[in-house]
C-alpha cells in the first residue's frame, strides 16, 4: 500500500471522527487488503474494533451497552453481508460506512451518491490517472447525477475547460479529419464513445443508425437549415434532429465565436459539398433563404438573385418585404455575409444607379444647382461606391453584365441629362447667378475669423467626396461640421481654382494664360504664400505631405503665431491625372477623406487649433468606359490656344455643335480680360493627344464646378459620449414556446454623442448556462423615428425540461467589453418541452 494512499485513508477517518457527537464508522474491506495495517493507524478520538463473521452480537453489545459513548472504527476484512444475514444492519443505518477504494474515496471527497458512483466505477480508468482525476474534480459539478457525471467524464477525456456537453461535442468536431478523430478514439479507449452518442441523442435529438461524426455534422447543418428555410429536400429529412432548439444554440455559439469561426467555416463547406446544398437550395424560392446563415452558398444564391434582378432593371424586387439595399445591409452583417461584404456593397450601390435609369434633370442651371447639392450628388457618390467595391472583387467577370448596365445608365441616363441641363441658361453675368462663389471664398469664409483658421484645400475633392468627409467628421463628438456648396471657376482646373481661393481684389488671366492675383503669380507654394501673407502677414502655406511626416513639436511650430494657414492636399488629382492610375481615383477619394479627417484630429490635439475649413479647387468627372470617337469633339482651336480635354481658352470662342462659350471677364469679374473659355455642354471631351480620358476636369458640370466648403469647429477637452442601449419592446413575462420572437429597439440614433456597438442576446438559466441560440445585433441605426430602429429577434430554446418555479433570464451583453446591459427574468412554462418532436 502506498504511503500516499495510507495517509489519505487516515486523514479521511480522522476527519470523520473530529465531528461533533458520537461516530461509528463501519469499514467493510472486501479483500482484507488493510487487515495488517488497521491497528497501526494513528486514529484520533476513536477506538478500533475488529468485526468477524461470528462476533456480530458481541459487537452489538459492545457498541450499544458496554461502551455507548466512544467513537469506533469497526473494521471487517470481508464484504458486507446481505441484510438478512447482517445483525448490525440497524446500527449501520445510523452510522457511517467507509470505503477505501479510489472511486469510493473520490466519491467521499466530492459528495457523490450511489448513482454517480456507479458511473465512476464503470469508467474507473478515466479518473485512475492523476491529471484526468484532477480535471474531473475541478469541474465542481452542482449535482452528480448520472447524466452530469457522464458528461464530466466526456469532457475530462476531451480536455474541456468546463463540463458542458456542448464543449465535448465541439472538441469532437474540431478534432475530426478525413482519416481519423483522435478525440473520439480516446473516448473509445475508455468505452465512452457509446456514452457520447447516447448524449447526442438525449441532448440534440440526434438518433441515426450506426452514428458517426460525418452524419452528426450533416444533422447539425440540416437541422439548422430546417429551422431557417422551413422546407428541406426529402433526402435530408432523416438527418433532422428531434431537438432543434439545442442544435441551434450550439451552432450559433460555435459560428459566432472568434476562436471557432474558421473551423465552423471548414465544416460548413464540407457539409455543403456532401449535400450538394447549393443545387438543392437553388430549387427553393429565394424568400425562404433570407434568414439562413449556416451555409456559405446561401449568400451566393442571394447575391446571384440580386444580380439577375438588377440586370433586369427590376428595382422593385424584394424578398420578405426587404428591397435589395435593405437585404444587402442585413446580410452583410451575417457570418458568411461578412465574407461577401464587397459584393453586397457593390450590389447595394448598383441598385441606386439602376434606380436612376429614369432620372429627370431639372429644367435649367439654377434648379440643377439646388437639386444637385441636396440630392443628386448622391448618385455620383453611389457610382463611386459601386466601383470602389467592384474593383475589390476577386472575380469581377461574374458581374460584367451588371457593370455594363451601371455604366450605361450613369452615362446615358444621368450625365447625359444633368450636364446639358446645367449648361442651359448658364449665367453670363459677372455675378454668376445667386450662388455662393469660389472666388469670394477668402472674403466670406476666412477674412472675418478672429481665431486661427486652418484651410485645407484638397485638389479635385468634388462635392460628394466632401459630403462623405463631413459625415465622417460629424462622428467625432468634439466636432461641429457645416457643409455648404460653392460655385467654382470656369475653366475648372487647378491653377485658376487655387487662385480663386486666395485673398484678392483682382484675378486675371494673361494672354499667355498665366493666372495672376493682384498682379502676383500664384502657381507654386512659395508664390501662394506670398499672396496670402500680403493680406495676412501672420500666415503660411504648407504641403499636406510635409505635415504628415512631422513630429509633434515640429507640427506645433508650423501653426504657432499664425492667424491663417493654408494646407495643400493632393491625393485625388495626383492619381486621377495620370493615365496609368486614373482608375484608382475613387480609391484615392476614400483615402483623402480618411487622411484629412485624421490630420484635423491631429492638429486639433497637438497645435491648439480648433477651426478648420476644407474645400477644393475643382471637382472632376470620371467614367469607367472607354470613350467612343463620338464622345470627342474635334479641336478646331489655333495652336496658340490653351487646350484641355474639357475646355479651350482663346481669344475667340470655338464654333462647334455642343460647345458653349463664356467670356473670361465674366468668370473673373473683370472688364479688361479679352479671353473666352469654350466648353462642351455635355460630358464630351475635345480631341487632345496623350493623357488619360476617363478622369477629366476643367469643364462645366455640377461634378466639376460645385465644390464643397466644410466649416469644422473642434471643441476643447472631451465631450461626454454614450454607447447606444438596447431596449426590449415586447411584453415578456412567460415563455410558452420553444421558438419565440421578441421585438427590440435601439434606444437612440447613432450620432456624434451616441456610439454604435454590437450586442449578444440570449437566454440563460439561474446558473447562467445558455439555454437558447444567441443573436448578434449590430446597433448602428441612424433613423430618427423609433420605428426605424426597431427589429425582431428569434430565439430557439434547447429542448429540455424547464422548471416553471425557477428563474430564467433574457440577457444582453455589449460585445466590445462583455458588460451585461440587459437582464429580464422570465418564467419558462413549456409543457413537456423535452418530448417535443418538431418533425420536419
Locations of the language-model features?
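…; additionally, a secondary subgroup of soluble metalloenzymes is captured
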Residues: 1-453, 462-612, 616-840
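Beta1/beta-strand and adjacent pyrophosphate-binding region of the FAD-binding site
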Residues: 456
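Ligand-binding pocket scaffold of soluble enzyme catalytic domains
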Residues: 459
Amino acid at each position: 500500500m502506498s504511503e500516499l494512499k495510507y495517509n489519505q485513508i487516515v486523514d479521511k477517518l480522522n476527519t470523520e471522527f473530529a465531528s461533533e457527537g458520537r461516530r461509528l464508522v463501519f469499514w467493510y474491506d472486501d479483500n482484507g487488503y488493510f487487515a495488517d495495517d488497521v491497528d497501526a493507524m494513528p486514529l484520533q478520538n476513536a477506538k478500533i474494533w475488529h468485526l468477524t463473521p461470528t462476533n456480530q452480537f458481541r459487537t452489538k453489545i459492545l457498541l450499544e451497552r458496554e461502551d455507548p459513548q466512544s467513537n469506533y472504527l469497526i473494521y471487517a476484512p470481508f464484504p458486507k453481508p446481505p441484510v438478512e444475514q447482517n445483525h448490525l444492519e440497524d446500527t449501520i443505518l445510523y452510522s457511517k460506512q467507509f470505503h477505501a477504494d479510489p472511486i469510493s474515496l473520490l466519491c467521499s471527497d466530492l459528495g457523490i451518491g450511489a448513482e454517480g458512483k456507479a458511473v465512476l466505477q464503470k469508467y474507473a480508468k478515466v479518473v485512475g490517472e492523476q491529471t484526468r482525476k484532477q480535471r474531473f474534480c475541478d469541474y465542481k459539478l452542482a449535482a452528480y447525477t448520472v447524466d452530469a457525471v457522464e458528461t464530466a467524464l466526456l469532457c475530462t477525456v476531451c480536455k474541456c475547460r468546463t463540463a458542458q456537453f456542448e464543449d465535448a461535442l465541439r472538441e469532437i468536431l474540431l478534432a475530426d479529419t478525413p482519416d481519423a478523430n483522435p478525440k473520439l478514439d480516446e473516448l473509445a479507449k475508455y468505452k465512452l464513445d457509446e456514452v457520447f452518442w447516447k448524449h447526442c441523442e438525449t441532448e440534440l435529438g440526434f438518433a441515426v443508425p450506426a452514428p458517426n461524426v460525418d452524419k452528426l455534422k450533416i444533422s447539425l447543418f440540416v437541422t439548422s437549415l430546417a429551422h431557417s428555410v422551413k422546407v428541406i429536400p426529402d433526402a435530408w429529412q432523416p438527418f433532422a434532429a428531434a431537438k432543434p432548439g439545442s442544435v441551434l444554440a450550439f451552432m450559433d455559439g460555435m459560428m459566432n465565436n472568434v476562436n471557432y469561426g474558421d473551423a465552423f467555416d471548414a465544416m460548413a463547406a464540407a457539409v455543403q459539398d456532401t449535400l450538394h446544398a447549393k443545387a438543392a437550395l437553388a430549387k427553393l424560392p429565394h424568400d425562404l433563404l433570407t434568414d439562413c446563415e449556416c451555409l456559405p452558398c446561401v449568400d451566393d444564391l442571394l447575391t446571384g438573385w440580386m444580380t439577375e434582378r438588377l440586370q433586369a432593371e427590376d428595382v422593385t424586387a424584394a424578398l420578405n418585404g426587404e428591397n435589395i439595399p435593405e437585404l444587402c445591409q442585413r446580410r452583410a452583417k451575417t457570418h458568411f455575409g461578412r465574407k461577401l461584404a464587397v459584393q453586397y456593397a457593390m450590389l447595394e450601390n448598383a441598385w441606386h444607379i439602376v434606380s436612376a435609369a429614369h432620372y429627370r434633370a431639372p429644367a435649367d442651371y439654377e434648379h440643377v444647382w439646388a437639386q444637385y447639392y441636396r440630392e443628386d450628388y448622391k448618385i455620383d457618390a453611389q457610382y463611386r461606391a459601386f466601383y470602389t467595391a467592384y474593383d475589390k472583387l476577386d472575380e469581377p467577370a461574374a458581374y460584367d453584365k451588371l457593370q455594363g448596365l451601371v455604366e450605361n445608365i450613369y452615362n446615358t441616363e444621368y450625365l447625359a441629362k444633368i450636364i446639358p441641363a446645367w449648361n442651359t441658361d448658364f449665367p453670363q453675368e459677372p455675378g454668376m447667378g445667386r450662388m455662393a462663389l469660389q472666388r469670394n471664398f477668402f472674403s466670406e469664409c476666412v477674412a472675418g475669423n478672429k481665431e486661427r483658421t486652418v484651410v485645407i484645400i484638397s485638389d479635385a475633392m468634388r462635392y460628394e467626396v466632401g459630403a462623405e468627409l463631413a459625415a465622417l467628421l460629424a462622428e467625432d463628438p468634439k466636432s461641429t461640421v457645416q457643409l455648404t456648396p460653392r460655385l467654382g471657376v470656369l475653366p475648372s482646373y487647378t491653377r485658376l481654382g487655387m487662385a480663386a481661393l486666395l485673398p484678392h481684389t483682382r484675378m486675371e488671366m494673361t494672354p499667355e494664360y498665366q493666372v495672376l492675383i493682384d498682379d502676383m503669380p500664384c502657381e507654386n507654394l512659395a508664390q501662394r504664400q506670398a499672396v496670402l501673407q500680403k493680406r495676412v502677414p501672420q500666415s503660411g502655406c504648407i504641403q499636406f505631405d510635409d505635415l504628415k511626416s512631422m513630429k509633434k513639436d515640429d507640427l506645433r511650430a508650423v501653426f504657432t503665431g499664425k492667424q491663417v494657414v493654408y494646407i495643400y492636399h493632393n491625393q485625388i488629382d495626383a492619381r486621377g491625372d495620370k493615365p496609368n492610375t486614373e482608375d484608382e481615383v475613387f480609391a484615392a477619394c476614400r483615402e483623402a477623406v480618411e487622411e484629412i479627417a485624421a490630420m484635423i484630429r491631429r492638429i486639433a490635439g497637438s497645435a491648439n487649433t480648433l477651426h478648420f475649413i476644407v474645400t477644393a479647387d475643382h471637382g472632376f468627372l470620371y467614367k469607367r468606359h472607354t470613350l467612343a470617337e463620338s464622345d470627342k469633339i474635334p479641336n478646331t482651336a489655333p495652336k496658340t490656344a490653351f487646350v484641355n480635354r474639357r475646355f479651350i481658352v482663346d481669344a475667340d470662342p470655338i464654333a462647334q455643335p455642343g460647345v458653349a462659350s463664356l467670356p473670361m471677364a465674366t468668370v473673373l469679374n473683370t472688364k479688361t480680360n479679352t479671353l473666352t473659355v469654350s466648353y462642351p455642354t455635355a460630358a464630351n471631351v475635345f480631341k487632345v493627344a496623350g493623357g488619360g480620358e476617363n478622369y477629366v476636369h476643367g469643364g462645366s458640370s455640377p461634378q466639376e464646378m460645385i465644390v464643397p466648403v466644410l466649416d469644422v469647429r473642434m471643441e476643447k477637452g472631451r465631450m461626454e459620449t454614450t454607447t447606444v442601449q438596447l431596449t426590449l419592446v415586447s411584453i415578456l413575462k412567460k415563455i410558452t414556446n420553444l421558438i419565440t420572437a421578441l421585438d427590440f429597439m435601439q434606444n437612440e440614433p447613432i450620432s456624434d454623442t451616441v456610439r454604435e456597438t454590437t450586442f449578444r442576446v440570449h437566454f440563460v438559466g439561474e446558473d447562467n448556462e445558455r439555454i437558447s441560440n444567441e443573436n448578434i445585433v449590430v446597433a448602428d441605426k441612424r433613423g430618427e423615428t423609433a420605428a426605424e430602429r426597431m427589429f425582431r429577434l428569434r430565439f430557439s430554446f434547447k429542448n429540455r425540461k424547464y422548471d416553471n418555479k425557477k428563474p430564467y433570464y433574457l440577457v444582453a451583453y455589449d460585445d466590445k467589453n462583455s458588460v451585461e446591459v440587459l437582464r429580464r427574468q422570465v418564467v419558462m412554462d413549456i409543457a413537456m418541452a423535452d418530448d417535443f418532436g418538431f418533425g420536419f
